[in-house]
């Protein structure tokens, strides 16, 4: 075959694989086969000197650009007017209603009833991509002033989900947002000399970096949502435009909703606010835009904003405040960790007074000092984290000092990697109290009525120094505790006795194995079925369990090597604790061994209950649709997973059809 022809075929094939992997989340080729074809293409391009502008080899270069050139957008990239209350949305909606009524009263060609399209407002860097009449990406640019941006074509090409060539023969400008996912952010920060402060700066800084290789290291993603300019036939609705974007292979977010009333808009705002911190990228609100393009054109623009769209903004999830002090606390494992005491600041609707600092290495890398202004970030409803300092605030600040002894018991501290630990396992109150509370917890041994206050008294007054000591408690001694009368003492003893009959997964979780949570405990029990089998498990056997990686496997092996661990377990068993495993019989069903994806809202099942139901039927529940998916169960407001299932020919079931099958 002619070598140029072979290059063209390889480019087409590799771009198809990239689209499947980075946009659809589904790969039809192994990494090994992809790499083989990629390097075959590299060699052919070197040999012939023939390189297509949309070849995947053109995505990443080691070039350092001398400067950014300016790019004049064909169509302006507008800012959006912003609202922070439903009342402001109502006022905007009422203006639209008034305009529509007045226009339809005086015009022969009536406008359709108002319909709004809701999409997420991404918190990254706006980009504008230009494709020529051959469908080839020719320019990537930042928003800039809205009229003129900076040419970041080389940087944009490092985003692997962005197509370098599309099936379109009209000149086109398409708008989107370059973002950094939390996974990419955490990976970059784990290796970077200077950590990034937030996801938005990670994306913006990458695209505005003249060193393209540095941009590539940040592993950016992108979502597209608007065609700014297109030669040829115009779109009639925004939904038609969004479908065009999707069919051309651009990455799009799953969330697109149609609303016609304020009540519907309010429900969507509440929904997105609830899931905001569960996303692996940042959003700062919702965009509400009129669907009908003719209505948009007639409404027009103010000097700054389009009148036909508005952004509902959420409370900020990042802020700056002053670091007042650092408090060192001892955890269940004995790890001594720093917590920042902050000048109170409002963050995502919550008053924040404390934040995570992780360890001394983290403090040094971020340059955090007492008295400095610090960047604080809140996500996933966990304790906020300090991401860095405001450099201008460092004058007159003090260094944070590492403790020399345990802040709780005064014992010697030891270093293990980047962390410090208290060695006084039995005599350090916070360690022992937290260990006992964890052991007695609802998802562990489920000792009813047990509290941290009770654990503290057991440690201080009854000299409880191990979890097995709980099963040696005596009625008369419990009466010596504060607020313990005969009834409360007996209730506690009864609850402790009842806890002896427990599931193996609850017992395993109660032991407090590092990095083993409730779900991992369940997965381990399903695989090994007995404590004895788990104790003997090899590293290879452990990592074969779903979601058990190298770190978890090593934690389990090290845990069962400890002489004290084995002594405590044997003592618990000798005291009558009886962890048992009942192998659940999986019923024969059409779902046995099948891969099932659930999308949308179901009437009779929560996400947890449908997952449990499917697993009881022998199905494997997946979070994404691919060629390997056997069934998709679609509820109300099913999103892109439904569309993808249709395009792949996957069997789609309604909730009723699913129930009829079982």
Swiss-Prot record:
The keyword Manganese applies. Zn(2+) binds at residues 406, 409, 422, 428. It catalyses: NAD(+) + (deoxyribonucleotide)n-3'-hydroxyl + 5'-phospho-(deoxyribonucleotide)m = (deoxyribonucleotide)n+m + AMP + beta-nicotinamide D-nucleotide. PROSITE patterns: BRCT (PS50172), DNA_LIGASE_N2 (PS01056). One of its GO terms (cellular component) is cytosol. The active site is at residue 121. Its cofactor is Mg(2+); Mn(2+). Residues 586-662 form the BRCT domain. The keyword Protein biosynthesis does not apply. One of its GO terms (biological process) is DNA repair. GO terms for molecular function: DNA binding; DNA ligase (NAD+) activity; metal ion binding. NAD(+) binds at residues 31-35, 79-80, 143, 177, 313. Pfam families: BRCT, DNA_ligase_aden, DNA_ligase_OB, HHH_2, HHH_5. InterPro entries: BRCT_dom (IPR001357), BRCT_dom_sf (IPR036420), DisA/LigA_HHH (IPR041663), DNA_ligase (IPR001679), DNA_ligase_CS (IPR033136), DNAligase_adenylation (IPR013839), DNAligase_N (IPR013840), Hlx-hairpin-Hlx_DNA-bd_motif (IPR003583). SUPFAM superfamilies: BRCT domain, DNA ligase/mRNA capping enzyme, catalytic domain, Nucleic acid-binding proteins, RuvA domain 2-like. Belongs to the NAD-dependent DNA ligase family. LigA subfamily. DNA ligase that catalyzes the formation of phosphodiester linkages between 5'-phosphoryl and 3'-hydroxyl groups in double-stranded DNA using NAD as a coenzyme and as the energy source for the reaction. It is essential for DNA replication and repair of damaged DNA. PANTHER family: CHROMOSOME TRANSMISSION FIDELITY FACTOR 18, DNA LIGASE. This is DNA ligase.
């Amino acid at each position: 075959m002619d070598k140029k022809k072979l290059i063209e075929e390889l480019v087409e094939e590799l771009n198809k694989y990239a689209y499947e992997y980075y946009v659809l989340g589904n790969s039809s080729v192994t990494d090994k086969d992809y790499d083989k074809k990629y390097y075959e293409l590299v060699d052919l391009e070197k040999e012939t000197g023939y390189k297509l502008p949309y070849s995947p080899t053109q995505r990443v270069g080691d070039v350092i650009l001398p400067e950014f050139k300016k790019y004049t957008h064909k169509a302006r990239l507008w800012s959006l007017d912003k609202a922070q209350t439903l009342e402001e949305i109502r006022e905007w909606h009422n203006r639209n209603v008034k305009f529509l009524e007045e226009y339809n009263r005086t015009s022969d060609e009536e406008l359709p009833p108002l319909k709004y399209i809701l999409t997420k407002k991404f918190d990254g860097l706006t980009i504008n991509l230009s494709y020529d009449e051959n469908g080839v990406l020719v320019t990537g640019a930042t928003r800039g002033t809205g009229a003129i941006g900076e040419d970041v074509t080389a940087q944009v090409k490092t985003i692997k989900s962005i197509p370098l060539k599309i099936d379109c023969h009209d000149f086109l400008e398409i708008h989107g947002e370059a973002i950094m996912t939390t996974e990419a952010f955490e990976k970059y920060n784990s290796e970077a000399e200077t950590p990034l402060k937030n996801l938005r700066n990670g994306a913006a800084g990458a695209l505005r970096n003249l060193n393209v290789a540095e941009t590539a290291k940040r592993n950016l993603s992108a979502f597209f949502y608007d065609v700014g300019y297109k030669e040829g036939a115009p779109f009639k609705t925004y939904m038609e435009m969004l479908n065009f974007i999707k069919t051309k292979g651009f990455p799009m977010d799953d969330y697109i909703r149609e609303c016609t009333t304020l009540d519907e808009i309010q429900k969507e705002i509440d929904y997105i606010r609830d899931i905001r911190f569960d996303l692996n990228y940042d959003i700062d609100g919702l965009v509400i835009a009129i669907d009908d393009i003719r209505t948009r054109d007639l409404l027009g623009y103010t000097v700054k904003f389009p009148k036909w769209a508005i952004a509902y903004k959420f409370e900020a999830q990042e802020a700056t405040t002053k670091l007042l002090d650092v408090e060192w606390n001892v955890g269940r494992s004995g790890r001594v960790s720093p917590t920042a005491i902050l000048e109170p600041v409002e963050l995502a609707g919550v008053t924040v007074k404390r934040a995570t600092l992780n360890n001394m290495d983290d403090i040094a890398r971020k340059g955090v000092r007492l008295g400095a202004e610090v960047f604080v970030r809140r996500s996933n409803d966990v304790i906020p984290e300090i991401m860095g300092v405001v450099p201008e605030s460092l004058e007159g600040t003090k260094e944070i000092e590492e403790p020399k002894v345990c802040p709780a018991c005064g014992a010697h501290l030891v270093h293990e990697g980047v962390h410090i630990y208290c060695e006084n396992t039995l005599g350090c109150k916070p360690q022992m109290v937290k260990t006992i509370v964890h052991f007695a917890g609802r998802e562990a041994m489920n000792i009813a009525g047990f509290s941290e206050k009770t654990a503290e008294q057991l440690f201080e007054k009854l000299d409880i120094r191990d979890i097995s000591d709980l099963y040696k408690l005596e009625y008369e001694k419990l009466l010596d505790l504060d607020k313990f009368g005969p009834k409360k003492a007996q209730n506690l003893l009864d609850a402790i006795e009842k806890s002896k009959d427990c599931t193996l997964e609850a017992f395993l979780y109660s032991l407090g194995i590092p990095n083993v949570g409730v779900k991992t405990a369940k997965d381990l029990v399903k695989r090994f079925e007995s404590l004895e089998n788990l104790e003997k498990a090899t590293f290879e056997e452990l990592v074969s369990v779903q979601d058990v990686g190298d770190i978890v496997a090593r934690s389990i092996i090290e845990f069962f090597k400890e002489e004290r661990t084995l002594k405590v377990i044997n003592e618990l068993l000798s005291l009558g604790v009886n962890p048992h495993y009942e192998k659940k019989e999986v019923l024969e069903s059409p779902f046995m061994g099948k891969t099932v994806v659930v999308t949308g809202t179901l009437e009779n099942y929560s996400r947890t209950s449908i997952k449990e139901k499917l697993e009881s039927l022998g199905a494997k529940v997946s979070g994404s649709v691919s060629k390997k998916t056997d069934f998709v169960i679609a509820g109300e407001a099913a999103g892109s997973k439904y569309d993808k299932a249709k395009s792949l020919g996957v069997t789609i079931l309604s909730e009723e059809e699913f129930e009829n099958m079982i």
